[in-house]
Amino acid sequence: MASGSAGKPTGEAASPAPASAIGGASSQPRKRLVSVCDHCKGKMQLVADLLLLSSEARPVLFEGPASSGAGAESFEQCRDTIIARTKGLSILTHDVQSQLNMGRFGEAGDSLVELGDLVVSLTECSAHAAYLAAVATPGAQPAQPGLVDRYRVTRCRHEVEQGCAVLRATPLADMTPQLLLEVSQGLSRNLKFLTDACALASDKSRDRFSREQFKLGVKCMSTSASALLACVREVKVAPSELARSRCALFSGPLVQAVSALVGFATEPQFLGRAAAVSAEGKAVQTAILGGAMSVVSACVLLTQCLRDLAQHPDGGAKMSDHRERLRNSACAVSEGCTLLSQALRERSSPRTLPPVNSNSVN
């Protein structure tokens, strides 16, 4: 998962490379790191908004893209998985600091991708553990599944939006075959999940309108996707500004089609019923979600610090400030992991933690 530098404390990292060495590095790895920072930050914030800031108690079932398979685990299994992942997160936090300090922006970007995926997985497991702990309290009634998993389809919508945003914002010179392949595969994977999920919901719907609307929504989405992916293939075969502009042009209808389909699919009648829990169950849930929020908030700050450093590679007072913020945010990640582990072990809050209905992660 990470390099051998993991043996050092999280708050420490390798000595910074000379400013001249960092400033002389190719701008391409830095630009990619900025892009990775934006994507990881958006993904972590979305998952936190959906799973940690919700007042509802629902299981988190991981099927389809980015599955971690933990949805059917017991609380004890979730707890052990989360604690193990906090250790991996500490390793990655140290690695990304070291790589950045040595001017290895490409490696830092790769580590950040892994860190972002790990935070998402940890958040999903934490939300599921919080649900399991809450429904285990006296008087609790478990959630009833609906036709659609709001979390999964909303994640897919976000990924499609991100892929289309990349196509709109990337200059022609940076549209490498590898980037186009990654975007195409990401779009196809998430669109397939949406298609399968909505087809299943259509089959199980009781009223005629819903059955037909799911089918029509999928058809609209598929048509828009085919038009966009044809433009992406054209850019790969015959790159030109005209071909690139077509990607931007046809990405709009796909985003609109996916937004409409997910908006319909997440109407209350398709989502089942959240668990009913007592005040005791709510307190247990809040403690675990609050611990997870401490981790996510710190990782969002870490990502923002990395972005600032990637954009200001030439030294100076700002660079020193950014490095200090990076060290502080890395320490906050470590502290958040400790709080989450303690909340899971004790099923109570080790300190006053943010309420689950607070504002979105900033």
UniProtKB/Swiss-Prot annotation:
Ranges for region Disordered: 1-26
Top-rank lineage group of the source organism: Eukaryota
Keyword presence, Acetylation: yes
UniProtKB keywords: Acetylation
GO cellular component: a single term: stress fiber
One Pfam family per UniProt: Talin_IBS2B
Annotated positions of the N-acetylalanine modification: 2
Low complexity bias (residue ranges): 13-26
Induction comment: Down-regulated by microRNA MIR574-3p.
Molecular-function annotations in GO: actin binding; identical protein binding
Function: Actin-binding protein which may have an oncogenic function and regulates cell proliferation, migration and invasion in cancer cells.
Record text on subunit structure and interactions: May homodimerize. Interacts with F-actin.
UniProt-recorded name of the protein: Talin rod domain-containing protein 1
Organism of this sequence: Homo sapiens
Organism lineage: Eukaryota, Metazoa, Chordata, Craniata, Vertebrata
Gene name in the database record: TLNRD1
